[in-house]
Structures are given as structure tokens and as C-alpha cells.
Swiss-Prot record:
This is Transcription initiation factor IIA subunit 2. The lineage of its organism: Eukaryota, Metazoa, Ecdysozoa, Nematoda, Chromadorea. InterPro entries: TFIIA_a-hlx (IPR009083), TFIIA_b-brl (IPR009088), TFIIA_gsu (IPR003194), TFIIA_gsu_C (IPR015871), TFIIA_gsu_N (IPR015872). Pfam families: TFIIA_gamma_C, TFIIA_gamma_N. GO terms for biological process: RNA polymerase II preinitiation complex assembly. The keyword Transcription applies. Keywords: Nucleus, Transcription, Transcription regulation. TFIIA is a heterodimer of the large unprocessed subunit 1 and a small subunit gamma. It was originally believed to be a heterotrimer of an alpha, a beta and a gamma subunit. It comes from the Eukaryota. TFIIA is a component of the transcription machinery of RNA polymerase II and plays an important role in transcriptional activation. TFIIA in a complex with TBP mediates transcriptional activity. One of its GO terms (cellular component) is transcription factor TFIIA complex. Belongs to the TFIIA subunit 2 family. SUPFAM superfamilies: Transcription factor IIA (TFIIA), alpha-helical domain, Transcription factor IIA (TFIIA), beta-barrel domain. One of its GO terms (molecular function) is TBP-class protein binding.
Length: 113
């Protein structure tokens, strides 16, 4: 059985734009709802597959306070406050940040070198 893909990236600008476009197509009866769902599933699979290889930007951060954390279904969620963010070009501060970290290994890879 194939591992389900995280739907985390549907909340990105790209994911939201794709969803809105598909909703418009379904609303105009240009495509059926079932095709829209298949396209979003394909987006989930593709983005989860390609990002580990193509995304190379790194951001450093320092938070003054860890407000909450949770680990459920191989997903860590952290809520931190008073954060100083820095990358190679610029930096800034934010009052509150939610960090979601998903397990990057498939079930068969865990524990294997």
C-alpha cells in the first residue's frame, strides 16, 4: 500500500492558487469534482517528492519562548513566540510562529542507513 502524502503544502500560495483555479473550473462545470480531487492528490504527491531535492534555502531562527508543542502521527508542531528569523539575504522578527515538521522518511527507510 502506498504511503499517503502530507497535505501541508495545500496552504502555500501555490497550493491555494491551484485549489481556487480548480474550484472555478468545477463551478463552471469545465471539470468534474472527482478530477479536481485527483489533481490535488497529484499536487500533494509531487510537491512532497520534489521539495527535498529542490528547496535549498535555509533559515535560522531564535525564539524567546516555546508556547506549545505536539507530536502526533509522525508530525511535530511547535508554536514559538518572539522569533528572530535570518536567511542569507535578510532578517526580521515576528511575534508568533507555527512550525510544522513532518517525518521525511518512508516507513521502509526508518532505521536503515
Amino acid at each position: 500500500m502506498e504511503k499517503p502524502n502530507y497535505q501541508l503544502y495545500r496552504n502555500t500560495t501555490l497550493g491555494q492558487a491551484l485549489q481556487k483555479t480548480l474550484d472555478d473550473f468545477v463551478g463552471d462545470q469545465m471539470i468534474p469534482d472527482s478530477l479536481s480531487k485527483k489533481i490535488m492528490d497529484s499536487f500533494d504527491k509531487s510537491i512532497n517528492k520534489i521539495l527535498p531535492h529542490k528547496a535549498k534555502n535555509k533559515v535560522n531562527f531564535r525564539a524567546d519562548k516555546l508556547r506549545a508543542y505536539r507530536y502526533c502521527d509522525n508530525v511535530w508542531t511547535f508554536i514559538v513566540e518572539q522569533i528572530d528569523l535570518r536567511d542569507a539575504v535578510e532578517g526580521g522578527t515576528v511575534d508568533r510562529l507555527k512550525i510544522v515538521a513532518c517525518d521525511g522518511q518512508t516507513k521502509g527507510q526508518i532505521g536503515h542507513a
